Amino acid sequence: DYTVQLLCVIAEAKTIGFLPQGDQVQTVKKLVNKIENLLAIDPDDPQNYYVLSWLNFKVGSIPQVKKFCASILYGGLPEQLTVQKGIDYMKKAISLRPDYSVYYFDLGVYYKKTGHPEEARKLFEQASTITPNTPEEFVYRKRAEKELKKLGV
């Protein structure tokens, strides 16, 4: 079932940081394949792009020295995962679900981490003004407000 597969991918992605490094590398590879399969089933599900976005951003942010070590020790991380693709996939998720504040917040985090505070501010403002429809969105609204305070807004 598609929904079960998607939920398993999301759960696996959320727990990746708790795994030993070698297992993290292998799990990233598996997750990329699983998400590509899910996209083939439903190319309009924003959750697929959301997970793919985070994988790209996280792996793309890893310093080259660590990626080199991963290639020697564990067979390497997928080379196609980049910070820019992470940003692009999050924008795609937003285009498919423009009323979901979580995506705006996370894209704001990406921009903040890559040294673009003005872009981050705009996205945190958007995240804080969208009416929350889920418990998760209420949490992210508060987080967006905190980020805006940190940015002096």
Model-derived features: where do they sit?
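Short coil/linker segments at helix-helix boundaries
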Residues: 8-44, 54-95, 132-133, 137-139
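Register position in tetratricopeptide repeats
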Residues: 14, 58, 113, 147-150
